[in-house]
Amino acid sequence: MTEDKAQQKPSSTAEPTEPLATLERGPVSQFLADNGFDHQYLGRDAAGVELLEVERDFLLPVCTALYAYGFNYLECQCGYDLGAGQPLVSLYHLIKLADGADRPQEVRVQVKLPRQDPRVPSVYWIWKSADWQERETYDMYGIIFEGHPNLKRILMPEDWIGWPLRKDYITPDFYELQDAY
């Protein structure tokens, strides 16, 4: 019986194990890769939506290709801050609307931008719905959308200093309230 136990013990020498599962590209990422568009596939979120990351210099070519692929609706463009000293992110949630589709295909594209130079090309000329969404992201995070036809503050007063949703934003101690009359 002791011999059986000795044989059942795991060996102390580590045998090579199989590599961890790699991310299998989704159909949108595969389309972009097949057509030579530089991007990084980040996987899928809990809802099963593909998440891609592109460099800011490649945003317009990638978005133009996605529009040609059928992503005809920009559901949401937003920004977020990864934290003090970390990049800002511009995120695009695209949908392929088609007649008779049970569930439209979706993809999210993100661009990380350095805090010191948060510039990215505007996608307004591809999807007109980006107009006010890019303005709001500019107003709250200070991301500059180059080529936007009317990039100005939309929520805060024009003379407001700073970007209120950045994590390094310092809230003023005093707000000057003006009468609405």
From Swiss-Prot:
Its EC number is 7.1.1.-. Belongs to the complex I 30 kDa subunit family. GO terms for cellular component: plasma membrane-derived thylakoid membrane. NDH-1 shuttles electrons from an unknown electron donor, via FMN and iron-sulfur (Fe-S) centers, to quinones in the respiratory and/or the photosynthetic chain. The immediate electron acceptor for the enzyme in this species is believed to be plastoquinone. Couples the redox reaction to proton translocation, and thus conserves the redox energy in a proton gradient. Cyanobacterial NDH-1 also plays a role in inorganic carbon-concentration. This is NAD(P)H-quinone oxidoreductase subunit J. Residues 1-20 are annotated as: Disordered. Pfam families: Complex1_30kDa. It is a peripheral membrane protein. NDH-1 can be composed of about 15 different subunits; different subcomplexes with different compositions have been identified which probably have different functions.
